[in-house]
Structures are given as structure tokens and as C-alpha cells.
Regions:
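Acidic/histidine-enriched, beta-strand-rich ligand/metal-binding domains
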Residues: 2-72
Length: 72
């Protein structure tokens, strides 16, 4: 089952969707681009959800750290 969060504290990220069973994170950026990240541990996802700056957390802990693909 996926959980979806609207991101309020970021100029980069709009929404995230996380599937704990599959450990996939789908990130929707404010410009409309969507990427899917694979093998993302649940603690990384929740860190993103509670971060003071979701964009900074994403850049430090997710971007270029996990395999990903652009969602068309």
C-alpha cells in the first residue's frame, strides 16, 4: 500500500508517494517532472516527510544515492 504526502516546505518538491512493501519512492517536482526511486528504506522516506527542508533532505539523502528512472 502506498502513502502519499503533499510537500509544503519545499520549492523543489510537490508530492511524494512511498510504497513500503516495494520500497519505492515516487517524487513529483514542482515543475511537473516525476521520478521513481528504488530500494529506498522506510527511514529515509520518513526522514523526508518530517524534514524542515524537504528539498535539502532530498538532495543530501536521496538524489544520486538510489537507482531511479524518470516516469513518463
Amino acid at each position: 500500500m502506498s502513502e502519499i504526502w503533499e510537500i509544503q516546505n519545499s520549492s523543489q518538491l510537490e508530492k511524494i508517494e512511498y510504497d513500503e512493501f516495494k520500497q519505492t519512492l515516487i517524487v513529483t517536482f514542482v515543475r511537473g517532472t516525476v521520478y521513481k526511486y528504488f530500494d529506498v528504506p522506510v527511514y529515509i522516506n520518513y526522514g523526508l516527510v518530517i524534514a524542515d527542508s524537504a528539498g535539502s533532505y532530498f538532495n543530501k539523502n536521496i538524489a544520486r544515492k538510489f537507482k531511479f528512472k524518470k516516469v513518463e
